[in-house]
Amino acid sequence: MSVVAGAGLVGVVKSVTSNSAVVLLMSDPSFRLGVRIAGSQVMGVLSGTGGKSYALQLLDATEDVNLGDQLIARGSEGDKPFVPGVPVGTVTWVDNATGQLTKHANVEGFVKLTSLGVVSVILSTTADDPRDSLIPPKPKATPTPTVTVTVTPSPSKS
């Protein structure tokens, strides 16, 4: 289950007892999350580094990623453990080296993990899939005009 604070994603619940839960923070080196650049379909994998920033690996090196791009969680099948659309962070550095199979960047999270107070655990989501909000709607089919020719006899002049 996703763990969030006011500004975005904090981590994921790893285990639960009757009184508490153990959360794997985004900063943990074993943390992995599928993300996308907000407003696009560009996807990548975000990894914890053990520090204050995160490592982003884009799956397609030909895609553009820019300083200031915002990332959101891509989500998991069945929304567990990650729900889609949760804000993750902002790109702060991009490696524009050519000839690589993937593109790398650094990301600063929206949530400061060193100063957390109350967090929330997302137990379920709505039936609406927020991932669809980034996909443009399918174009409506253009109606085919129907032309009907009616021959009207003209009055004859006598």
List each model region and its residues.
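Extracytoplasmic/periplasmic terminal helices and flexible tails
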Residues: 1-158
